[in-house]
Amino acid sequence: MQMGESPARLRDGDFIKKLYHARSWAPARYLKYDPIDLAKRSMAPIQRAHTKIVGTTQADNLRSLAAKIWMIEQAQHTVDLVYYIYRHDLAGNAILGALCNAVQRGVDIRIMVDSLGSWSMNHEELKAFETCADNAGYIRDASGRATPFRARIQVVIVNALTSLSSWSNRRSHDKLIIVDGSFPGRDIVMTGGRNISIDYYGIKADGTLNRDSYIDLEILLRSENSTTANELTVGDVSSIYYTLLFLHKGNKRIHPSPYADDEQYGPNTYPQILGRQQRDLAFVKNLPAMKTVFASMPGYFANDFRSSQVRIAHELGNLTAKDTVTNVRETKSRNLNSIGA
């Protein structure tokens, strides 16, 4: 799918084929453009959207985790996530468990984590998670019909410390999840300050309430029903942004180890890791405090949104600029979508 191309211009079969290829990882040497440069030069539009703030209270902390899992469980076509910090604790495992179930029903998944904020020697948990796609279902079109395209899990490390095209002090602090971003009326975007770590979500590892969680907030965005057929939605623009970050030349695509199953016993074999993720998902959903929150999610996503005008701002230029600190004003001015431009 060409950047800026509206889904309404394409028949379902053509659209899914183009979408599948547009969502595919490709090494930088195969690209005809620099994704970060394109992101800086392309002005993001001001758009109409339904918005809701996920606030800073204890109840909001619980609601934020439930919302992420609920969004994934409601996804019909695609899910994209990127987080600076992704901890493989109760919250992180529960989300991966939900994503594993999603790909097996035919939802195409991309996930990015920052190489420093989510530092790991080998990212075994994410590699194990990718094997969920061994039993992936087939992506469905907007009418719900199965297509010939099998759902995937693509895991990318942002500005990998082992990449020759990366800089150790150039980080992605994105916290973003996009569900069905290219499907108007179904798209949901969540962004803000919460990372994927139990410290943000109001519960402790044993499931008891944690009233000392980090204080942060997020915003939910959905496209308006009044969006015209040829108008890009907030889901479209968020997905385009995600793709440009996904294809950044400093990133590294990781894959499961071909010899991972040679170790039959131990806590870190792929089946053991996947089992933990599913158990943690079930544990979170059955916590007394969380069961009530999960039960409220259909109404939460249906009501009390505000009609707003929004624009997706970003600082992707900082991933490649060599004078970010010494020449802040000029660096921001080169990015048409910078908050400080």
Predicted feature locations:
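Non-Sec secretion/translocation targeting segments of pathogen effectors
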Residues: 1-3
